[in-house]
Regions:
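Short loop/turn segments that flank or connect secondary-structure elements
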Residues: 1-206
Length: 206
């Protein structure tokens, strides 16, 4: 490879007219992203904008991604929740997810590919051999973090759900008999089921 790589890229930042990185279908987030934001002290500001995708079929994966919001200029289209449409810029640019740092270069485990052909920054600027190596290393790191997150999330989710179930069960056990009956009645009504005979007789006697 020559000193000047075939791959060249320069982010146009707020001069970009396609918003390709902001409107792409998914802006992935890794567990390492969360750890980095925690260490930087940004986690509480960023966390409200992060969602977890729940698998709809056995073939689907768990994954973290940024939340979406409709574009003011096109209500039928959505963008990353951290996209500031007025400024045409990312609100967390200097601490953005690793998937944004590598965009549009991506590593799929075998080769490097362009994740978007709509990004106008591709073909702009000159990328030295050293800069290309750094970009590829970062793309490989993003791939590694993405795979590790996909592998770990089912277990993390299961642990969290188990903890919530245990806490709910303990809270129910600590309820008084009267409060427990009231809770049962609320659950029964929410399901549209007829009240129990005991509850009905109590209501009639009252």
């Amino acid at each position: 490879m020559s000193e000047k790589s075939k791959y060249s890229f320069k982010c146009l930042e707020n001069k970009c007219d396609t918003k390709a990185c902001h409107i792409r279908p998914r802006v992935g987030v890794t567990i390492s992203d969360l750890a980095r934001w925690m260490n930087q002290g940004y986690i509480m500001n960023i966390l409200p904008g992060i969602t977890i995708h729940m698998p709809e079929t056995e073939k689907d994966d768990f994954y973290f991604e940024t939340a979406r919001k409709p574009l003011e200029s096109d209500s039928e289209s959505t963008a990353c929740v951290f996209y500031n449409e007025q400024a045409n810029a990312c609100e967390i640019r200097y601490s953005r997810p690793i998937s944004c740092q590598t965009f549009p270069l991506e590593f799929n485990g075998e080769k490097y590919v362009l994740s978007s052909k709509d990004c106008p920054g591709v073909g702009h600027g000159d990328v030295s051999k050293e800069a290309l190596q750094d970009a590829r290393k970062l793309a490989e790191q993003e791939y590694k973090e993405r795979i590790e997150t996909t592998a770990a999330l089912p277990a993390v989710y299961s642990v969290m759900m188990s903890q919530m179930i245990r806490q709910s069960a303990e809270a129910m056990q600590n309820l008084s008999e009267e409060d427990r009956k009231k809770m049962d009645e609320i659950i029964t009504k929410s399901r549209g089921e007829p009240a129990s005979e005991e509850s009905s007789s109590n209501d009639q006697s009252g």
